[in-house]
Amino acid sequence: MSSLYQKLSRRIGYFFADLGLLELALTHRSFGGKNNERLEFLGDSILNYVIAEDLFHRFPKAKEGELSRLRASLVKGDTLAELAREFELGDYLKLGAGELKSGGFRRDSILADTVEGIIGAMYLDAGMDVCRQHILAWYKERLDATSLKIVTKDAKTRLQEFLQARKHALPQYDVVNIVGEPHDQTFYVHCHIELCEEFIEGKGNSRRIAEQNAAAKALKKLEKKDV
């Protein structure tokens, strides 16, 4: 095993029998040829299952919606990107020249996908039991800190429920501008609601975050109006 992969293996706590699987898990589609997309697909399903199973046993009285929101908070891209940075995965990615130049090794989406790729590769290399063991080890602190008391619906969900309860049309979100270099972009989104004459703007470093920020502002405005 190369010293580079030994270092990474120590960080993730697992040494691959088939190094080719690890190398494939680290290969972005921009590199050309075989890449980690199929492993990512597999890893995503395994991660969702392992976290769902743990939460099911950890919170025996939780409702389905509460468990779903807890799981979503743990498997979302932001959390996976945090894990990737803890492992310093950016140092090991195989990226195409353009992606490398634009800072792809720092991009949350690429880092998150790589974590899922490694999970898929680990499953193929050692099976479900070993894979589960390592996922739960990676997530131990986050799982131990999880509580039903802090489960909250995101702003878009709360806004949708607010409008549905009052029999109003659902909001519409439009990306109106994207500013910055590919590796450091700011998205501007307009949220349109029939109860508001003007659009509500939100911004963030991803479309999802911009939409959530717009929804939060819209909800605050509607609650002030006491619609």
Curated annotation (Swiss-Prot):
It catalyses: Endonucleolytic cleavage to 5'-phosphomonoester. Coiled coil: none annotated. It is found in: Cytoplasm. It is an enzyme of class 3 (hydrolase). Its cofactor is Mg(2+). GO terms for molecular function: double-stranded RNA binding; metal ion binding; ribonuclease III activity; rRNA binding. Disulfide bonds: none annotated. Its EC number is 3.1.26.3. Belongs to the ribonuclease III family. Digests double-stranded RNA. Involved in the processing of primary rRNA transcript to yield the immediate precursors to the large and small rRNAs (23S and 16S). Processes some mRNAs, and tRNAs when they are encoded in the rRNA operon. Processes pre-crRNA and tracrRNA of type II CRISPR loci if present in the organism. This is Ribonuclease 3. It comes from Marinomonas sp. (strain MWYL1).
